Amino acid sequence: MPAVRGARPIRNSEVKEFHDSIIEPMPVTLERYASVWKEWMNYSDAKSLAGLDDFRFADYTQGTSQTFDQFILKHSKDREILVLRGDFQYHACLGKYVEFKYVSERNQLEEVLKGPGLHALLISAPFSDFGCMHPDFEEIMRICDVMDIPVCLDLAYWGIAKHCHIDLDFFPAIREVTCSLSKPFFTLENH
């Protein structure tokens, strides 16, 4: 049997009226989205993220890559962008166009610093290369705080992570937090 009307939905005013009568429309505002997102970030006992309420702004982007683009554009005017070796490869691609440096380990981080306020750092949690928190995460955040290095925290794999507990109140250098919905929910095809 051939598809009716080219497989398009059949418009039926009775069905639409019934549907509209049983479903209360709930507009998705940015405030509601941010609220649900913050709750979702802490839905599991296997991980926790405290301190999000202290961030003044919440927004959605076209994925974590757009956040990285914006962070790098914002800070590359007057800061060198730092990335730990083994982190997301996308950063290196952008590093071709800005002052950029890979850092192999925490000790090297201290060696490459040119002074306070001259760098910005992107770091993932769980760390891309390890699948868990970077073993030097807390010390790196301490260095960033002391040296006035703004940090973009990449939580792309947060939705499928375990054993990650971060209290943003302890890490004031973290100025931006981004996460991905495509990893835990496979939303890639919904763009």
What are these model-derived regions, one by one?
Residues 55, 77-80, 116-119, 146-150, ...:
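A general structural motif
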Residues 37-49, 131-190:
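Active-site pre-lysine segment of PLP-dependent enzymes
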Residues 61-67, 84-90, 128-129, 157-159, ...:
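Gly/Ser/Thr-rich loops at beta-strand to alpha-helix junctions
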Residues 5-9, 89-90, 104-162:
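Active-site phosphate-binding strand-loop segment of PLP-dependent enzymes
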Residues 71-92, 101-110:
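Conserved PLP-anchoring active-site segment centered on the Schiff-base-forming lysine
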Residues 94-108, 117-119, 173-180:
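Active-site regions of enzymes building and remodeling cell-envelope glycoconjugates
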Residues 1-66, 70, 74, 86:
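Conserved N-terminal alpha-helix of the aminotransferase class I/II PLP-enzyme fold
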